[in-house]
Amino acid sequence: MSTRESFNPESYELDKSFRLTRFTELKGTGCKVPQDVLQKLLESLQENHFQEDEQFLGAVMPRLGIGMDTCVIPLRHGGLSLVQTTDYIYPIVDDPYMMGRIACANVLSDLYAMGVTECDNMLMLLGVSNKMTDRERDKVMPLIIQGFKDAAEEAGTSVTGGQTVLNPWIVLGGVATTVCQPNEFIMPDNAVPGDVLVLTKPLGTQVAVAVHQWLDIPEKWNKIKLVVTQEDVELAYQEAMMNMARLNRTAAGLMHTFNAHAATDITGFGILGHAQNLAKQQRNEVSFVIHNLPVLAKMAAVSKACGNMFGLMHGTCPETSGGLLICLPREQAARFCAEIKSPKYGEGHQAWIIGIVEKGNRTARIIDKPRIIEVAPQVATQNVNPTPGATS
């Protein structure tokens, strides 16, 4: 995969100091309410929440509600289920077009975590910052919308509506909806002892985008310049941006091919938080143990140099539009990892076996000294794919 031409504000008649990420104080899915707080807030919704499976012509129609990536609701007309999710994030990169693509990929990822590969409809939720000038709004927001639209089209769906409001911070998100037969989705609750855990995107996106901003902040750059070069940071940033914009659709399809038992996507709670949430949903008495952490090259060293302020080694560092964490039969996992790299799926797809499923009490943990897998950037050095609509 090639790098994009860097977004140049002056090409859009904007001040050269324009930065999209300055229109928010939080980044990406770092906006999530902490898990323990969220669970308390949702208690009243869960008290009377009917979540038992239903029957249709003798077949079980699964139901999934509050607590996981999507809802799965059996429809009144029988034999079909509504699978739906909503999500939104704040700007994490300064390229508006790519930010739109990332926001769309992030919404769709919740469907893909269910093994759903076809989305019937999308809505876009857009918060336009009231701190933007008219020129900034009129130049930047259409690029974001175009990126969102293009990613939706790549996913085989379309944006048919939504809501746009004024807000102090820019907000980007949407709703993804599909109607499925039971064989078109995989319930996230069937992991068994002996399964292995597979991850389909490297960790460290939040670190990469943060340290990229530090290039302009000498007091912060001085903390890490002995462990990373400016070129390392630029490559990690480009790799993070491309990974976040990449759909998890291929992995969702391969979940069916290789008999996945459960999955979730890795976003604002970090890999450990999402692994713990997935473990709680299991029907069997199992626990997840993570031994390996695939991380964007040099970002583990950066995290350590910062006193692990990002929580990367502890698995608590937020990710935005991260990969899928999939429970696969041991005998299928290596084949999954090999297949997803096939050129027929396009460039950039990767996967790693990172842990095991063992008999336990529905918890997840990372071992004390996990193996760090340094994931080299796949982006090329040339610049291609300029942002649509730029003036020369």
From Swiss-Prot:
Changing H274Y: Increased ATP-binding. Mg(2+) binds at D69, D110, D265. It is an enzyme of class 2 (transferase). Activated by phosphate ions and by potassium ions. The keyword Kinase applies. The modification N-acetylserine is found at S2. It catalyses: hydrogenselenide + ATP + H2O = selenophosphate + AMP + phosphate + 2 H(+). This is Selenide, water dikinase 1.
